[in-house]
Amino acid sequence: MNAKNLHTLGIDIGSTTVKIAILNDENEVLFSDYERHFANIQETLSDLLGRALYKLGPIQVSPVITGSGGLTLAKHLGVPFVQEVIAVSTALQDYAPQTDVAIELGGEDAKIIYFEGGNVEQRMNGVCAGGTGSFIDQMASLLQTDASGLNEYAKNYKALYSIAARCGVFAKTDIQPLINDGAAKEDLAASIFQAVVNQTISGLACGKPIRGHVAFLGGPLHFLSELREAFIRTLKLDDEHIIAPNHSHLFAAIGSALNSKRDTPMELRDMQNRLENK
């Protein structure tokens, strides 16, 4: 078929969300969306494909899957899989080739990717979800709000407290007495974000400098402006060195679409049927 009629579909299956991006032959994003999957990955992906079908009609796509929960599904559907670090690197190469370091926070993982002279080094957190999106959700519930509520509080902070972000249990031990003592929610919210920054920098960079052009990727850094500001403040970045793309929460999905070899075309509807019949 005509390559111009074949779109690429990137699917990112994360620990808490599913993201999709459909690109045209000029690698422009025609459709993108994301949804929390609550462990119902196939159902969630089917819903997202349904939305794409509603908007774009019965198009042909060449899909590629990435993400921590993507390999099993890729095998299941007979669709190519690409490692997330490769997907993200490809998207950055396309959007912001000047990137020196990328900081990516997900629902249950955190990564720092260094780009040095053609080499790519990825550092990732271990089994604990401290300092990630789910940690932020957990801390927000202590303040009887959600992540976006935490973000609103943090906009008006006046003081920062020391909170351990390496573990939700330790953080709770730090926060509860402050709540009991009447600490302002604004200050606690900003302190939680600062704890995430400290955990990411000390736990992942481990002394290796984060400098040059820094890209902020992943849902928490996309949706939570004050978390992003806490990183910028701590790393002392000026505007010229901050890379915060409009689609930063979809970068792995976009990057996986960019990795498509365009050799596995299928109808969106067929893909949806495969998900619903397995």
Where are these regions (language model features)?
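Short glycine-rich, Thr/Ser-proximal phosphate-binding strand/loop in the N-terminal lobe
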Residues: 5-43, 47, 121-122, 126
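Short beta-strand-loop/turn "lid" adjacent to the catalytic site in phosphate-handling enzymes
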Residues: 25-27, 34-37, 52-86, 114-122
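Glycine-rich phosphate-binding loop plus the immediately following alpha-helix
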Residues: 41, 117-159, 258-262
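Phosphate/pyrophosphate-binding loops at sites that engage ATP/ADP/AMP, CoA/4′-phosphopantetheine
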Residues: 48-61, 200-212
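Glycine-rich phosphate-binding loops at beta-strand->alpha-helix junctions
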Residues: 69, 206-234, 245-249
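Conserved phosphate-binding/catalytic loops in two-lobed NTP-binding clefts
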Residues: 81-85, 231-254
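Glycine-rich phosphate-binding/hydrolytic loop that grips phosphoryl groups
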Residues: 136-137, 243-277
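Adenine-nucleotide phosphate-binding core of ATP-dependent small-molecule kinases
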Residues: 171-206, 249
